[in-house]
Amino acid sequence: MATLFRGALIGGAVLAAALPATGQQTDADPDTMRVCASTKDAPYSTADLDGFENRIAEIIADEAGLTLEMVQVEKDAIFLHRDGIEQDICEVIIGVDEGDERMLTSEPYYRSAYAFVARQDRGFEGHTWQDIDQEGYDTFAYRYHSPAETILKYSGRYEYNLIYQASLVDFEDRRNQYTQVPAERVVDEVSSGKADLGILFAPEAARFVKDSREPLEMTLITDRIERSDGLVIPLQYSQSVGVADDSPELLEKIDAALESGSARIRAVLEEEGIPTLPMN
């Protein structure tokens, strides 16, 4: 029950295939780059293909001289590898952590960090995770399954914030299912004054911070979390393109495209308002 439609691509062709969440196997074409893209992952990827990672996929395919097939998966992005690459409906995922062990990864094409988002009229000052411990900052909005939860736990703010955070998903039971707060909702909570501070990965916040009617400021967190058991949780991450393990030739083409198209990719990130860090 797949529906097909065509869209425009700078200098090339893009074929977007909307598939049910269970996926549908298709034969790989060496002249086609099949990218799995979530319909529920704004601002990275959307059903309308206007996410910034959708645009980066177009640039990579164009630079590599490949036809882009966007395989839209109607699930959250966390399921793209399991329900996409493992089901052989695509070979590529845009925007994975460098060195992700589930697949081959390209050279990173940008690096960013978790960030604090605050209203400008609050005058928040801080750039380390410990800086949330300030008078007047009691309510925090964040996305689940992220270092933000660890920051709140280590700051002694997690339990106090639990009921408010649960309200962001309408108190949905999180047991045995994946539950997530949209990035836009996190930023809206700060903009409206319902949350004193937002904590989330800067790339997922940037578009909504820029578009907010209430002036907001986003501050990158500069340190990392060192847990009591010695485990270090980084708060800065380099982003790469994930490629299926059995497609090393495609990875080579993607690496070359990332290099030749670096200025175009940088322009997308700048337009999105994403703050970037030097590569390690």
Regions found by a protein language model. Name each.
Residues 7-18:
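Bacterial N-terminal signal peptides
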Residues 21-23:
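Boundary at the C-terminal end of the N-terminal hydrophobic targeting segment
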Residues 25-102, 176-180, 271-275:
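Extracytoplasmic small-molecule ligand-binding "clamshell" domains
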Residues 37-41, 111-123, 170-172, 210-256, ...:
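Periplasmic-binding protein-like
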Residues 39-42, 46-63, 116, 120-181, ...:
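Bilobed "Venus flytrap"/periplasmic-binding protein-like clamshell domains
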Residues 51-64, 120-148, 229-274:
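Extended ligand-binding regions for polar small-molecule ligands
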Residues 58, 62, 70-134, 145-147, ...:
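Acidic, polar ligand-binding/catalytic clefts
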Residues 65-67, 85-95, 136-139, 185-186, ...:
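Alpha-to-beta junction loops
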